[in-house]
From Swiss-Prot:
Gene that specifies this protein: tti1
Pfam families in the cross-refs: TPR_TTI1_C (PF24181), TPR_TTI1_N (PF24173), TTI1 (PF21547)
Name of the molecule in the record: TEL2-interacting protein 1
One GO CC term, this protein: cytosol
Matching InterPro entries: ARM-type_fold (IPR016024), TELO2-interacting_protein_1 (IPR052587), Tti1 (IPR016441), TTI1_rpt (IPR049362)
Lineage: Eukaryota, Fungi, Dikarya, Ascomycota, Taphrinomycotina
Organism: Schizosaccharomyces pombe (strain 972 / ATCC 24843)
Signal peptide: none
Length: 1098
């Protein structure tokens, strides 16, 4: 069986059944079985679809006629058939056309099908009677019409075909603005319109397109209007494509440039002739099209990417081909394209759209484009004059973005930029200087360009308004008269300090940073920028007059923000100039380095971040590896600047921080310079000690020096410890002592091998020799061999010089000398600082106590200097505990803790006589045995007291002093333990304190933690009295401890009472659960060493 026979066999029965039910439709009077007809149409459609599913072959025309025969009555009398049946019938026609009639190109059949389908779509029962058609039937009908129209090639000179074309076009256009139309129906009708107007198989004559142009524009515009029905993105895109192609074909500049006047137009001989194309027709049509285009351009605010692409293509072809015809809307077309290009969500359009637009502008005549851009800029100026004052920020930003888009293409025609120069001041006035709310990360400020770095800062809030304005200012760099613009900005910037001058300063810097190509004397403007920036950097004193209280005033706060922004703009300019000059900028470091360090030390994080970024950029641009290397290479500049400030009594709040920064990054190499500065400070303090603010600033410098030197010493210890640990952890390398021992072996190969144990015992003659290790004996032997060798060389006159040892000795001597210089400088500073411990100003006394605390770390390296210093400042420090200022007391306790921890047993008598009575009084006055609030002054004093007592017990104290310290410490610990909200470091501090006391007397600590802390003071519990109960020393913290009341007995008294109770209530067989009093009283007695063996005595 052939393929066609197989299809026929499958569809024969369904279509035979359909013929039976559809034949009555041929007569108007015969009755129709609606259900049977509907079911037969359904079976026929599904049978045909099933038969044609797995085949690509076309149906023969005779088979198509056989199938179509029972469907024709349904199409003609569709109003007598249920809508579902009509739907199945039209779908059968669609299948027949796709698989058979499409290749036949039967003109008459195509026209008949079009007419029948249009009647069904429009609901025509007769030329005089219509009904509302079912929406589902209309959708299927227009989808079928789309396929049928593809084969329709009308002859417009044939009236019948002309009218059929007009009816099909009008029916499709009527559906687009209809509110009852679905998306599917709109899409199908738009596809029909597209195939009718823009066919691929033939060219629609322009004169006939002109006839239908008003209806096409009207129908599509109504659908695309803001309140139109065409909202689905696919429908919008196809509507824009149809409208663009239609307008370009009808009124393009090439098609309308030689139109005749009205009187010269020839009349048409056809009775249905096309519209006459004359100049008056062009004016009327272009006006209608301009209004339509303006109504459609609201789509540029759409967020759909497909709509944005379609609208850009629509505007582009109209701007390219109808620039002269659509003069009324070409400004709107250009602005719409620029707005679409600048949308962030469509980067693809931004890339290819700008390239197309720039290429188009370059291809046009300059005169024409200058005229267009001039119109655009004049229109923007008119709008901006009404918006800039009263409109919201969003509206202003929208207009500025519009201007930015226009200026982006105006750069290709620089003459048009002259129109915007008068409006530059108004544009800059929208910026408000802001120095707060901006990220203060210095690394984010830096911008790399090849091998150089410079700052790219934000000064007006870092918002979109600032970025847009910056791009607008940058576009003026290619203006012909940019020279005059820069002169105007520079004169405004150097005038009185106000918002306008700061904005002009910023705009002047932005213009210079951009590629200014039309200025001949560019170096002159760069020098002017550098000079003014340097003047601004030297005016930091204007910012130091503001205090925290003064910033509460709104006007003063605005002035402060203004000065901060101006300083940051100057710093930005200096970094950019250093990137231009590179290594040549090194010669200017003498002038710029110290002002930048002052700004680095300024209290505002905004200003200090700019200064830090600038120093980093200068270090990179001048070929320094790090800012620390930059400082070490130019340390003399900084110290000389500090000395100059001191000589003129110009002590700013930034001087101490600058000195701290210098010491931190110089690795101790600045000592030889700072010594002169310290001497100058001493002289000023002696002469002007009555000036509190000057004194505070100078003492702050000394405090910064001491603090940083102490921190540097601690960091060096840590670094050395880490290096040794790393060396010990390296399994592939021996430790330092073994390597030294191996080196000695290589230098002394003749050293005898060690003896065995018996031989060594015979060779021991005294106790001293017995105690020497083999390594020490070997070292002594090596030294003797070296001395012996040296004597032999002297006798022979052949003495040699060990250059390596000499160099190492010289370096050691230099290191020792530098260390002595540091200690001597710190000693002088501490001697001067202790004179101000009695100053009437609390802040100065607090700073001096901190200075002594840090200075003790340095002085402790030389006990011969440290102990006499303690004798001098100790009485002045201890007396601070009697004051009523909690901050002063806390700092005094911190200093005492530092001194006691470093001086060891040197402080024993002072602890007993001077410190202990004051600590007891301090606890009562400040109620330190009570539970305090977290972070309160009492809480801080409790923590400081624990540090002091833990440092005191490390000295050789008597048992009485020890128990008194325990009586102070234990209640404070219980108070801290029972706080509702604990400080993060409280637990570790408590454990450290218990461990410090436990090293001297673990029994006392056990009693305080286990007995008093468990509420067993009144009567012993049976658990403690059980025979065999052993005491276990605990080195960890208990979780259940009870606060001791303020009036409770001291630890010593209660402990002795409990010992008495124990002795009276125990039997001889019971073991003692508590420590004996003998252990406590013999706390400090040294243990007797083991007896030496007899052989050592011999």
């Amino acid at each position: 069986m052939s393929h066609i026979q197989s299809i026929f066999a499958q569809i024969r029965d369904p279509f035979r059944k359909l013929s039976f039910y559809s034949l009555p439709l041929s007569s108007e009077t015969s009755s129709v079985d609606s259900n049977g007809l509907k079911n037969s149409l359904k079976d026929a459609y599904f049978g045909l679809e099933k038969a044609l599913t797995n085949t690509d072959a076309d149906l023969p025309l005779n088979l198509c006629d056989y199938i179509f025969f029972p469907i024709v009555p349904v199409l003609k009398s569709w109003y007598r058939v249920p809508s579902t049946g009509v739907e199945y019938a039209i779908q059968c026609v669609n299948l027949l056309y796709k698989h058979g009639w499409r290749e036949a190109h039967n003109e008459m059949l195509t026209m008949q099908l079009l007419l029948m389908l249009l009647n069904i779509a429009d609901g025509w029962k007769s030329p005089s009677e219509t009904v509302e058609q079912d929406f589902r039937v209309r959708e299927i009908t227009f989808e079928t019409l789309e396929n049928v129209i593809t084969d329709f090639k009308p002859n417009f000179h044939d009236k019948r075909q002309y009218l059929l074309f007009a009816r099909a076009l009008s029916s499709a256009l009527d559906i687009i603005p209809n509110k009852n139309s679905s998306r599917r129906l709109q899409f199908a009708s738009l596809c029909c319109v597209q195939k009718l107007i823009c066919p691929k198989q033939y060219r629609l004559p322009t004169e006939f397109l002109t006839t239908f142009l008003p209806g096409i524009v009207s129908g599509l515009t109504k659908g695309l209007a803001p309140n139109g029905t065409c909202q689905y993105f696919k429908n919008v895109c196809i509507s824009l494509n149809i409208l663009g192609d239609t307008v370009v074909k009808a009124i393009s500049d090439d098609n309308t440039k030689d139109l005749p006047d009205e009187k010269d137009a020839s009349s048409n001989s056809h009775f249905f002739g096309p519209t006459k194309r004359t100049k008056s027709w062009k004016r009327a049509t272009c006006q209608q099209l301009s209004n339509a285009v303006k109504a459609i351009l609201h789509l540029r605010s759409s967020q759909n990417l497909h709509v944005q692409d379609a609208l850009f293509d629509f505007c582009f072809i109209l701007f390219r081909d109808c620039l002269d015809s659509l003069k009324d809307c070409r400004i709107h077309l250009l602005e719409s394209m620029l707005k679409l290009i600048n949308k962030k969500e469509n980067p693809k359009l931004r890339d290819y759209g700008m390239n197309k637009l720039v290429s188009l502008i370059e291809s046009f005549n300059n005169i024409t484009m200058e005229s267009v851009l001039t119109e655009c800029l004049n229109d923007w100026s008119t709008t901006w004059s009404s918006v800039s004052t009263f409109a919201s920020e969003d509206n202003k930003l929208e207009e500025l973005n519009r201007l930015k888009s226009l200026l982006s293409i105006s750069s290709h025609l620089p003459k048009t930029l002259q129109l915007m120069e008068p409006l530059l001041d108004g544009i800059l006035s929208q910026l408000v200087p802001k120095s707060s709310g901006i990220d203060s990360n210095s690394q984010k400020l830096l911008t790399s360009s090849t091998s150089n770095e410079y700052i790219h800062g934000e000064f007006f809030g870092g918002n979109e308004m600032e970025r847009t304005t910056q791009e607008i200012v940058t576009s003026f760099a290619k203006a012909p008269n940019v020279k005059y613009v820069m002169q105007s900005l520079l004169s405004k910037a150097t005038s009185a300090t106000n918002e306008n001058s700061v904005r002009a300063f910023w705009a002047f810097m932005v213009l210079l940073k951009s590629d200014v190509e039309t200025v001949d004397s560019l170096e002159m403007y760069i020098d002017s920028l550098e000079q003014y920036s340097f003047e601004v950097l030297q005016q930091l004193s204007q910012l130091n007059v503001f205090t925290k209280a003064s910033l509460e005033d709104k006007q003063k706060k605005e002035k402060y923000n203004l000065l901060c922004v101006r300083s940051c703009i100057a710093i930005d300019s200096i970094s950019w100039i250093s990137s231009l000059q590179g290594v040549k900028f090194r010669s200017k470091l003498m002038a710029y380095f110290y002002p930048l360090l002052e700004h680095l030390a300024f209290a505002s994080p905004y200003v200090s971040s700019f200064a830090e970024a600038c120093i980093q950029a200068i270090a990179t641009n001048c070929n320094y590896s790090t800012p620390a290397e930059l400082l070490r290479e130019n340390i003399d500049y900084v110290v000389n600047s500090v000395a100059l400030k001191l000589n003129t009594l110009d002590v700013s709040p930034q001087l101490p921080i600058v000195m701290a920064y210098v010491i931190k990054n110089d690795d101790g190499g600045c000592i030889r310079y700072i010594g002169d500065v310290v001497d100058a400070i001493f002289g000023i303090l002696d002469a002007y000690h009555g000036y509190a603010r000057l004194t505070e600033g100078l003492l702050g410098i000394l405090y910064a020096i001491i603090k940083q030197e102490s921190i540097n010493g601690e960091e060096k210890k840590l670094i050395v410890g880490v290096e040794e640990d790393a060396m010990n952890e390296d399994k592939n390398k021996p430790c330092k002592k073994i390597r030294e021992f191996v080196q000695l072996l290589l230098e002394n190969p003749n050293y005898p091998l060690p003896k065995d144990d018996h031989e060594l015992e015979d060779m021991i003659h005294d106790e001293q020799q017995e105690t020497k290790s083999g390594h020490e004996q070997f070292r002594e032997h090596a030294m003797k061999e070296k001395e012996k060798k040296g004597k032999e060389n002297e006798n022979m006159g052949e003495t040699t010089v060990d250059h390596e040892n000499i160099n190492s000795n010289v370096m050691d001597e230099q290191g020792e000398k530098q260390k002595d210089d540091v200690v001597d400088m710190v000693r002088k500073i501490t001697e001067k600082a202790q004179l101000f411990l009695s100053h009437e100003q609390i802040t100065i006394r607090v700073e001096m106590l901190k200075l002594l605390s840090y200075g003790s770390n340095v002085l402790a390296k030389e006990p011969n200097t440290f102990y006499p210093a303690i004798n001098t400042f100790w009485p002045l420090v201890v007396i601070q505990l009697d004051t009523d200022n909690e901050l002063l007391v806390e700092c005094a306790l911190e200093t005492i803790y530092q001194v006691c921890a470093l001086a060891d047993d040197f402080m024993t008598s002072r602890i007993r006589q001077d410190l202990l009575p004051r600590l007891e009084t301090l606890c009562q006055r400040w109620h330190l045995f009570n539970v305090a609030r977290t972070y309160s002054s009492e809480h801080r004093l409790q923590r400081a007291m624990l540090k002091v007592t833990s440092a005191c017990v490390a000295n050789k104290l008597s048992i009485v002093v020890y128990l008194k310290l325990m009586g102070i410490t234990a209640p404070i610990i219980r108070a801290i333990t029972h706080m509702s909200q604990k400080y993060a470091g409280d637990e570790s501090l408590v454990e450290e304190t218990w461990n410090a006391f436990s090293k001297q007397n673990p029994d006392a600590v056990y009693y305080e933690r286990e007995v008093r802390g468990s509420q067993m003071i009144d009567t012993f519990s049976t658990e403690l009295l059980i025979p065999g109960k052993q005491r276990v020393q605990r080195t960890y913290r208990r979780t259940h401890e009870v606060l001791e009341p303020v009036g409770a007995k001291t630890s010593e008294t209660v402990f002795n009472d409990l010992l008495g109770q124990q002795g009276s209530g125990k039997t001889e067989t019971q073991e003692e659960p508590l420590p004996s009093l003998d252990n406590l009283l013999h706390l400090n007695q040294p243990k007797k060493g083991a007896k030496k063996p007899l052989i050592s005595i011999i």
